[in-house]
Amino acid sequence: MTANPSYLRTLDHFKVGQVFHHLPHKTVTESDNNLFCLLTLNHHPLHSDVEYARQSQHGRILVVGSYVLSLIVGMTVPDISGTAIANLEYEKVTHDGPVFVGDTLRAETEVLDVRVSKSKPDRGVICVETRGFNQKNERVLTFRRRVLIPTEIPPAYRPYSSE
């Protein structure tokens, strides 16, 4: 068994200004949206009732914004937080545009800051900004987060590492 090498990133793999283009992209399905609504008890008709949505600003069902955030965060895991000790903070979450069933989303992340912890030098914090786009290259989501990253590959990952 081999691990995806991107999951083995430690603090020294991150540089300010570095941009990651995350794969794979994802086409949002009606089932994705419906399941997320059910799991989170979001029963707003804008996300599930075609007739109600037809009368709305966009004229069709809108994908739940918290699903879009969750999906885009998930896309970043292999490159950004695969070895994370913790996600410390999400901030400045902005829904920049609507997402509809059938949209194909992609994400990119820029490293804004990297610092070693003063109290625990075996780890550090990265601050990143992630942007989500649809198939028309329109930005649909932006957020920043701080992630606690180890300075060495965690013991659980060492069997998969070449170090």
Residue ranges and their predicted role:
Residues 1-16, 99-104, 108-163:
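HotDog/MaoC-like acyl-thioester-processing domains
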Residues 60, 73-78, 83-113, 118, ...:
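Catalytic-pocket segment enriched in acidic/His residues
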Residues 2-90, 141, 151-163:
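Hot-dog-fold acyl-thioester-processing enzymes
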